[in-house]
Amino acid sequence: MHKKTDFIGIDAPHRPDTFYGLAKCFAEDLGSMYWDKRGMESVCMRILSCAQVTNTRALGTWLSYDDLIQLVERAIDTPVTGFSVVYGVSNNDRAPVDHAKASFLGYRPTDNAAQFA
């Protein structure tokens, strides 16, 4: 399990701490396998939190509804994605993850949870 203070890059190894997290890891591995074996493209989105900001942790993990819509639309509209894993997080000052990889989709998050601090 990653420490809560760790900055987690997109290429960090899977470290699930719940069965839900384990299922998400399986889905990513399944997408990778289908890309390798069948050339089926997919974009796996690691959405950290999309609910209203109610605690300090969410100041880093929040994904606004507008940014979520933009991310999904960009993933659908991008002509070639291969197999991709991206973090779904708004442009938060305290983001604990690197969401730069989503830029190839044209994703440019505009919201920031700092407004709730």
Residue locations for each model-derived region?
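Catalytic helix-loop patch of NAD(P)-dependent Rossmann-fold dehydrogenases
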Residues: 1-38
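A short C-terminal helix-loop "cap" of Rossmann-like NAD(P)-dependent dehydrogenase/epimerase domains
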Residues: 5-13, 44-53
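Residues that recognize and position ribonucleotide moieties
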Residues: 6, 43, 61, 95
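Glycine-rich "substrate-gating" loop/helix at the edge of Rossmann-like oxidoreductase active sites
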Residues: 17-21, 53-63
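Ligand-binding pocket scaffold of soluble enzyme catalytic domains
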Residues: 27, 42-45
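Alpha-helical substrate-binding/gating segment
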Residues: 36-39, 46-52, 62-83, 91
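Conserved C-terminal active-site "lid" loop/helix of NAD(P)H-dependent oxidoreductases
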Residues: 84-86, 91-108
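Amphipathic terminal alpha-helices
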Residues: 113-117
